[in-house]
Design a protein with these regions (language model features):
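Generic hydrophobic, amphipathic alpha-helix propensity
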Residues: 1, 52, 149-157, 174, ...
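DNA-binding recognition helix and immediately preceding turn/loop
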Residues: 4-8, 140-141, 162-176, 219-223, ...
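Amphipathic alpha-helical segments used for helix-helix packing
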Residues: 8-9, 15-39, 53-54, 86, ...
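C-terminal peripheral helix-coil segments that are non-catalytic and often amphipathic
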Residues: 19, 50-61, 80, 90-155, ...
Length: 336
């Protein structure tokens, strides 16, 4: 590819990654099985990331791309391509593969930041979170005995399902962990699959609630992106086992797994559309933006939090700063 210019070379490698994700969708779903996470999944994605790290590093050394963390960019691109290759089952006009690749190149080079000046408050720091909105009574702690029992079962399910996987976990282990009788379990759930489906929806609610508590404190969509991503990684660090359950459940009940992401995407799209109208975000297709940003955030969370077997797992300040730089400004070198 040495005879091509940098944009053409970037097109070649992104088209290769997007096509690979699209043509190997079933294999990517198989990698969601929790039993395979340490043994196969890490090595598989690392082998892909190694190629893209090398490409990004080489282009940065030539002055063709900005020298951001190549590992972050590599996993971010994997996430962007993977989420845009999924069949989300939504109606309406769909973009062609070539159109999606063109948009990924545009996003990679130019970022999402719009033309409106971003006025950051005094004392603003890229790694800081505002105080979250307090929970109201409706969204706070469970108040009835039945609600408390159901939440205890969900809390136990997070631990047991996360440790053993959906297939190997059994109801007896979950009820013992929750401190309830098996008969009580069947008052609330028809089966283990019914529990897992309920747990996926419960987790989705918790995450959306957490993000809203922080994002509602912001006035600018770019600030909302920054705060939302920080809040997501904070949530993920507290609930690492969740991301071993949701992908695995896609193998059993794809509709619920897809619902999990579509529910998150629906609210996200509204905020990005408003940001576009205020010129805080560039005029890129909202559906593409949602899938790209969700994919990038998802895979970086996997790489730095879920796939790290230490209590200190997390996205470092420097990596997060480079994520924001990549999302907002892209990799195209700035003119002096």
């Amino acid at each position: 590819m040495s005879e091509l210019d940098v944009v053409s070379r970037l097109r070649e490698v992104i088209h290769l990654l997007f096509r690979h994700c699209k043509e190997n969708f079933a294999f990517h779903r198989l990698l969601g099985e929790s039993e395979l996470i340490d043994r196969v999944t890490l090595g598989y994605y690392e082998s892909i990331a190694r190629y893209y790290r090398s490409f990004i590093r080489q282009e940065a050394q030539l002055g063709n791309l900005r020298p951001l963390d190549p590992n972050m960019v590599a996993y971010g691109l994997i996430g962007i391509c993977y989420f845009n290759s999924l069949d989300w089952g939504t109606a309406g006009k769909k973009l062609s593969s070539d159109q999606i690749v063109d948009l990924i190149i545009d996003l990679t080079l130019n970022g999402i930041i719009g033309s409106k000046p971003w006025r950051k408050p005094t004392g603003w720091e890229i790694n800081s979170l505002p105080e979250p909105q307090p929970l109201n009574a409706k969204n706070g702690e469970p108040v009835t005995k039945g609600e408390k029992t159901r939440q205890a079962i969900f809390n136990a399910a997070e631990k047991i399902l996360g440790q053993n996987g959906v297939n190997r976990a059994n109801i007896g282990e979950i009820t013992r962990e929750a401190g309830v009788a098996q008969g009580t379990f069947y008052i609330h759930f028809d089966s283990k699959i019914d529990l897992v489906e309920g747990f996926v929806k419960y987790t989705n609610h918790l995450l959306r609630q957490e993000l809203q508590r922080y994002v509602s404190r912001t006035q600018d969509r770019r600030e909302a992106e920054r705060v939302g991503m920080l809040a997501f990684y904070k949530f993920l660090s507290r609930h690492r086992k969740i991301y071993r359950v949701v992908p695995e459940f896609e193998m059993i009940g794809r509709e619920v797994g897809l619902w999990y992401y579509k529910k998150l995407a629906a609210g996200y799209a509204k905020g990005l559309e408003q940001g576009k109208e205020r010129k805080e975000i560039r005029k890129l297709p909202v559906t593409f933006l949602v899938r790209s940003l969700m994919g990038l955030t998802h895979f970086i969370g996997l790489k730095w939090i879920i796939w790290v077997n230490t209590p200190q797992a997390g996205v470092s300040s420097q990596v997060f700063e480079d994520i924001m730089d990549f999302i907002f400004q892209g990799l195209k070198p700035t003119k002096e």
